[in-house]
Amino acid sequence: MMRRLAVLVLAVAMVAACGGGVVGVAGASCNAGQLTVCAGAIAGGARPTAACCSSLRAQQGCFCQFAKDPRYGRYVNSPNARKAVSSCGIALPTCH
């Protein structure tokens, strides 16, 4: 489990460092690298930290873009990610 978490954090950090984690959405700055603080909640099912909830709120407008991106989709659409978002009191958007 810890190895999987480490791989997730490393993968997101590498993509973000290469500029691949930044996606523009209607003036919003979408950066999947900001969600690395949520790795424990998303990959491991841990309770999201305050920093995680803050990052999720900041990236809320980007959820659909991340969900459609093959690099992040399986994490964003996972039951643990949905649980983390819900625990932070954030409504999941309906993506088209």
Curated annotation (Swiss-Prot):
One BP term from GO: lipid transport
Pfam families referenced in this protein's UniProt entry, alphabetically: Tryp_alpha_amyl
Keyword Transport attributed: yes
Disulfide bonds listed in the record: 30-62, 38-52, 53-88, 64-95
Keyword Transport: yes
A GO term, aspect molecular function: lipid binding
Keywords: Disulfide bond, Lipid-binding, Signal, Transport
Signal peptide segment: 1-27
Task of the protein: Transfer lipids across membranes. May play a role in plant defense or in the biosynthesis of cuticle layers.
Family membership: Belongs to the plant LTP family. B11E subfamily.
The protein's name in its UniProt record: Non-specific lipid-transfer protein 2
Gene name, Swiss-Prot/TrEMBL: LTP-2
